[in-house]
C-alpha cells in the first residue's frame, strides 16, 4: 500500500509525494479522511503531510480494528474492534487528542462489522 497525492485543481499524481506503507501491517486497505491533515488506513492513523504514523489502533485497543466503513463524527473515528478473546467492542478514537475509549460491547454472535452508521 502507498498514499499518493493529487493537488487541488490537478488531474495527475504529484510526482513529489509518495508515502510508501510497505513496512507497515496495513490490513484490508480501509481508508478514511479524518480531517486536520490525518487519514486512517487500518489500523493506522497517518499524518499525511509529514508522512508519519501517529497512532496504531491495534496497539492502542489491544485488538484488531475490523470495520470496513468507519464513522467519523464530531472529531472522532468509531471502529469495531475484535479482541484476542473474540469479544467485539466499538472504540472511539479522538483525532485531536490521539486517545481511544472503549464503548459498547457487540453481541458475541457477530462475526464481522462492515459499517457503522451515525451514533445517537
What are these regions (language model features)?
Residues 82-87, 96-120:
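Blade-level signature of beta-propeller repeat domains, shared across WD40, Kelch, NHL, RCC1
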Residues 1-43:
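Acidic, serine/threonine- and glycine-rich low-complexity intrinsically disordered segments
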Residues 20-36, 62-73, 108-120:
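Repeated scaffold domains used in trafficking and secretory/extracellular systems
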Residues 43-44, 48, 80-85:
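Short, flexible beta-strand-to-coil junctions
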Residues 1-10, 45-52, 90-97:
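Beta-propeller blade signature
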Amino acid at each position: 500500500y502507498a498514499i499518493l497525492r493529487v493537488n487541488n485543481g490537478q488531474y495527475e499524481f504529484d510526482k513529489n509525494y509518495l508515502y510508501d506503507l510497505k513496512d507497515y501491517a496495513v490490513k484490508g486497505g480501509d481508508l478514511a479522511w479524518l480531517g486536520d491533515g490525518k487519514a486512517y488506513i487500518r489500523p493506522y492513523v497517518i499524518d499525511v503531510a509529514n508522512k508519519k504514523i501517529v497512532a496504531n489502533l491495534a496497539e492502542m485497543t489491544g485488538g484488531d480494528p475490523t470495520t470496513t466503513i468507519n464513522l467519523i463524527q464530531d472529531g472522532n473515528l468509531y471502529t469495531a474492534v475484535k479482541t484476542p478473546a473474540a469479544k467485539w467492542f466499538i472504540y472511539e478514537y479522538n483525532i485531536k487528542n490521539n486517545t481511544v475509549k472503549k464503548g459498547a460491547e457487540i453481541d458475541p454472535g457477530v462475526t464481522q462489522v462492515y459499517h457503522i452508521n451515525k451514533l445517537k
